[in-house]
């Protein structure tokens, strides 16, 4: 699970700047340039997608590891790969690993989800600062509004708090799309379409203070 908690009261989160901090005048516009937060299990990237502030959420242990013939058997070992390299013939390795990986849906990393906050009324922040000493990201707006967010050092939990907002802001949970879009095969670099995994689309349940995403994976995972 990935638990992200909102704080609805003013909190004191003292920070200490360092020369290695990341600081920019606005949010990154692509996920791979987002402000990184996380520990060895869960992680988040803070960035802007269109007109929304987005937390891209993930876990390191979300994998579809259904059995595949291409990675089973006695040749599924590095020593066998080394033998082919020493013989000067790498094609058997490509046929065993690369070709099936590009053609079959698994094994595959499964994405987590995302949390979005509309910036339609609030606008984009004028300063985004990642404090490395404190593992805390702070976004500041010219009207005095702030966002502070961090991930627990050892637990799969994250927090965020908005302060001095001119109006309320409601998060939206965005789930990966497993049953929409095309099913065209990609490759090991570009990634595969999630529809090829064959999952039934998960459900999102909301109540007054909680949003929960339920997704069943292969073999009941």
Question: For each predicted feature, which ranges?
Answer:
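Aromatic-residue-lined binding/catalytic grooves and analogous aromatic/hydrophobic interfacial grooves
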Residues: 11-221
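C-terminal motif of bacterial Sec signal peptides marking the signal peptidase cleavage site
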Residues: 4-6
């Amino acid at each position: 699970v990935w638990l992200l908690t909102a704080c609805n009261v003013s909190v004191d989160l003292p920070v200490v700047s360092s020369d290695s901090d990341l600081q920019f005048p606005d949010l990154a516009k692509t996920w791979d340039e987002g402000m990184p937060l996380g520990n060895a299990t869960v992680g988040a990237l803070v960035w802007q997608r269109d007109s929304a502030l987005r937390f891209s959420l993930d876990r390191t242990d979300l994998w579809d590891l259904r059995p595949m013939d291409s990675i089973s058997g006695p040749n599924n070992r590095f020593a066998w790969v080394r033998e082919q390299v020493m013989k000067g013939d790498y094609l058997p390795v490509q046929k065993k690993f690369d070709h099936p990986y590009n053609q079959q849906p698994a094994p595959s990393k499964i994405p987590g989800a995302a949390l979005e906050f509309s910036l339609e009324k609030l606008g984009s922040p004028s300063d985004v600062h990642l404090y490395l000493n404190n593992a805390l990201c702070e976004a500041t707006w010219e009207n005095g509004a702030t966002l502070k967010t961090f991930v627990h050092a050892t637990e799969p939990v994250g927090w965020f708090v908005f302060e001095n907002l001119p109006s309320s802001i409601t998060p939206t949970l965005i789930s990966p799309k497993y049953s929409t879009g095309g099913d065209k095969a990609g490759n090991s670099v570009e990634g595969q379409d999630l529809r090829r995994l064959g999952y039934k689309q998960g459900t999102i349940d909301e109540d007054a203070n909680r949003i929960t995403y339920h997704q069943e994976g292969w073999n009941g995972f």
